[in-house]
Amino acid sequence: MVKDSYCSFCGTRFSDDAPWPRRCLGCSNSTYRNPLPVAVVLLPMADGVVVVRRNIEPRKGTLTLPGGYIDLGETWQEGGRRELLEETGIEIDKNDLTLYDVRNGLDNTLVIMGLAKEMPLNALKPFTSKETQEVTLIDRPIELGFPLHTEVVKRYFAEKVTGKKGG
């Protein structure tokens, strides 16, 4: 069964080619398909950025920036702080995250990139979890598991070299 194939109000099946938002022929209510918010954190440390090796799909085994879905009731900063802690064991204050970028991501997501305050190298400890095989640093742009992460890291390091923001 295809996701969102039925009206969430009355259960009437939508035509597969019906555009979004979909107006139900059974009850006349409109159904919308909205993007899911994701928080991703750029955490500067020493001369690099913290990345994780994923232990779950998608992109299991690849390096990515820490992040994940924002839970209902969370601000993007709270979601970013929680995801960073869950995936790296590193705790930050939600107020130490500033908006870095917002992009459309894969699978109907809206990715909110937060830049954290730089942390000392001794904050990086060995860490694994259900979601994380490894936490490490990168000191230059590399290919990451998600193309969007690669683009943002490339921009971050370019701005670090030039001292200019907004590249």
Model-inferred region functions:
Residues 1-40:
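Acidic, metal-coordinating catalytic segment for phosphate/diphosphate chemistry
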Residues 32-33, 59, 106-107:
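Short glycine/serine/proline-enriched coil/turn segments at secondary-structure junctions
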Residues 37-39, 59-61, 95:
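A generic structural signal for short beta-strands and their flanking turns/coil linkers
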Residues 43-44, 51, 115, 137:
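Conserved hydrophobic "DFG−1" position in protein kinase catalytic cores
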Residues 44-86:
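Conserved Nudix-box catalytic region and its N-terminal flanking loop in Nudix hydrolases
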Residues 66, 121-123, 167:
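A short Gly-Trp-Pro
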Residues 70-155, 159:
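Unchanged
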Residues 159-167:
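Generic C-terminal helix-cap and adjacent flexible tail
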